[in-house]
A protein has these predicted regions:
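Pre-Walker A (P-loop) beta-loop-beta motif of ABC nucleotide-binding domains
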Residues: 22-33
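Conserved ABC transporter NBD signature motif
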Residues: 58-66
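The feature captures the beta-strand-to-loop junction immediately N-terminal to the Walker
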Residues: 35-37
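Non-catalytic connector elements of ABC transporters
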Residues: 237, 247-378
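ABC ATPase nucleotide-binding domains
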Residues: 31, 72-78, 82-229
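Helix-to-loop junction immediately C-terminal to a conserved catalytic motif
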Residues: 50
Length: 378
């Protein structure tokens, strides 16, 4: 529908920096998520894109046209809010039809278009119902249908699923993606829900303290995070302190064991770093150390099990015996390991376990948090 560019956007509220030097190009038909914790600037960025807030500096470009100073209704954008924002005195049909009526579309044309949209969103049977007669999921579907009815160049979604329950949320995010692909609408989704962003986005923009932390595809953000913030914010991540032995060769050391690890190449020799690995990538070896085959192992005691359905998460505390005599390497306080629930009974709370850490499924990063680990702070 449209190409969107945000160029060096900045925004302050008093002395507080809300958004700092934000630049992003969104391709025609792409769905990009702004993901981050509360207060990171994602909604403010969306509101500046829509025209509800003016940036202190920077520009908003749609298909090569600078719309920074245009009012909201002149930007060819549709917006869906967290709280639905439906007209309570209008039926679902009338809500969806509203934007078309304001634009003076012929009655027959707009009624046909509304009927098509209601079917697209599974609302054909509730078209004559008022908002208070609809469930939360149905109200949000009406809001989505109303937003796309005017065929906007860009669709802006501000936490659209946060007010519905988990089951409906999962259904709606699938519907949003299906609708977005079918209609080809360039879309920005603001969310704090990692699974929501990762499951339906073409790219994810991770935001932190008003700035872009990193941008990538869902797979890149999840499997290859470039910062400790992203690694910790996106799903569960183990952070294992290591020392860079040879940046030239990408070699790190843990308890005297040296391995080649992804991401270590080029890092300064002697620096502390973090070896990042997801709980599902770790492999329990029982109570005896198997052949390492270039990987690391860690010995821990199971503190608690958390049932997650098909998998169970074991929370381990590393045992001091895993350290070499005289090593200055700080221990990993805790480690999360996912195992099939069918076999979780092998490792009850209190049991000792050796875990294989496959370096091929890990990534090394340097970060100030690594320095905190080296001081024993976690």
């Amino acid at each position: 529908m449209a190409r969107l560019e945000l160029n060096k956007i900045n925004k302050r509220f008093g002395d507080q920096v809300a958004v700092a030097d934000f630049s992003l190009a969104v391709a025609d038909g792409e769905l990009v998520s702004f993901l981050g914790p509360s207060g990171c600037g994602k909604t403010t960025t969306l509101r500046m894109t829509a025209g509800f807030e003016l940036p202190d500096s920077g520009s908003v470009i749609v298909d090569g046209v600078d719309v920074t100073d245009l009012p909201t209704n002149k930007r060819a954008m549709g917006m869906v809010f967290q709280g639905y924002a439906l007209f309570p005195n209008m039926t679902a049909i009338e809500n969806v039809e509203f934007g078309l009526a304001v634009r003076g579309r012929p009655v027959a044309e707009r009624r046909a278009q509304v009927a098509e949209l209601l079917e697209l969103f599974g609302l054909g049977h509730v078209g004559g119902s008022y908002p208070h007669q609809l469930s939360g999921g149905q109200q949000q579907r009406v809001a989505l249908a109303r937003a796309v009815a005017v065929k906007p160049g860009v669709l802006l979604l501000d936490e659209p699923l946060s007010a519905v329950d988990a089951k409906v949320r999962e259904e709606l995010r699938t519907e949003i993606r299906r609708m977005q692909v079918q209609l080809g609408i360039t879309t920005i989704l603001v969310t704090h829900d990692q699974s929501e962003a990762l499951s339906i986005s073409d790219r994810v923009v991770v935001m932190n303290r008003g700035s872009i932390e990193e941008i990538g595809t869902p797979t890149q953000i999840y499997a290859e995070p470039r910062s400790a913030f992203t690694a910790g914010f996106i799903g569960a991540m183990n952070e294992i302190p290591v020392r860079i032995v040879s940046g030239a060769n990408g070699i790190v050391e843990r308890w005297g064991r040296r391995v080649t690890a992804p991401g270590a190449a080029g890092l300064p020799d002697g620096d502390m770093a973090l070896l990042l690995v997801r709980p599902e990538s770790l492999e329990p070896l029982g109570t005896t150390k198997a052949a390492l085959n270039g990987d690391l192992t860690l010995t821990g005691r199971v503190e608690v099990q958390t049932f997650l359905g098909a998998t169970t998460r074991l929370l381990l505390r590393e045992l001091p015996g895993g350290a070499d005599e005289g090593s200055a390497m700080p221990p990993t306080q805790r480690l999360a390991v996912d195992v099939p629930s069918s076999s979780a009974g092998q490792w009850p709370a209190g049991s000792e376990i050796v875990v294989r850490i496959p370096v091929t499924a890990s990534r090394v990063i340097t970060d100030r948090s690594a320095e905190r680990h080296s001081r024993g702070v976690h």
